[in-house]
Amino acid sequence: MSDVKSRAALAALFVACMIGLGLGLYAYFHGPAASGMRRETITLTTSAGPKAISAEIALSGPEQEQGLMFRKQLGDDEGMLFVYQRPQDITMWMRNTYIPLDMVFISSDSRIAHIVEGAEPLSERIISSGGKAQSVLELKAGTVRRLGLATGDRVAASSLASVP
C-alpha cells in the first residue's frame, strides 16, 4: 500500500514540475517585455510632428538574435530597437516571428534610411537595409503608415546617442 502512495506522490510531483516549467516558458516567451531588456521611449519626428514609441532595446548579440521571435502580440505603440556598434549592411528575417512587422532602418545620423512594411511572419526571406544602417526599429505592421513615417525622418533615442 505504501508503494502505491509513494508512486502517486511522485506522479503528483512530476505533474506539478511540468506545469511549473510550462508556465515559466510561456511567461518567458509571451509576457510583456518577455526578454527582460530595458525599455526606452523613441521619438519619431515626422512631417506631422513627433510620435512616441516604447521600445525594448536589443544591444547584445543574444538579444538581437532573439529579437521578437516567439511573441504573439505587440502593442500599437511598441517596438524593438536593434542598435549596432557601427554602420553596416544589416539583414533581418522573420524566422520564428509570429507578428507581421514594419522594419525601419536608421542611419548613423539618426535618420530613417530605408523602410520595409509588412514583413511576412515566419518567412526566412532576407530583409536588407538597402545600404549602411546603424539600427533597426521593428514595429507592428501598419505602424509606419499609421504614423506617416518616411525616409529622412529623424529618430531620437538615448541608445542611439550613446553609440560611438
Residue ranges and their predicted role:
Residues 2-14:
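Membrane-entry signal-anchor segments at the cytosolic-membrane interface
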Residues 2, 22-164:
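Compact, glycine-rich, soluble single-domain proteins
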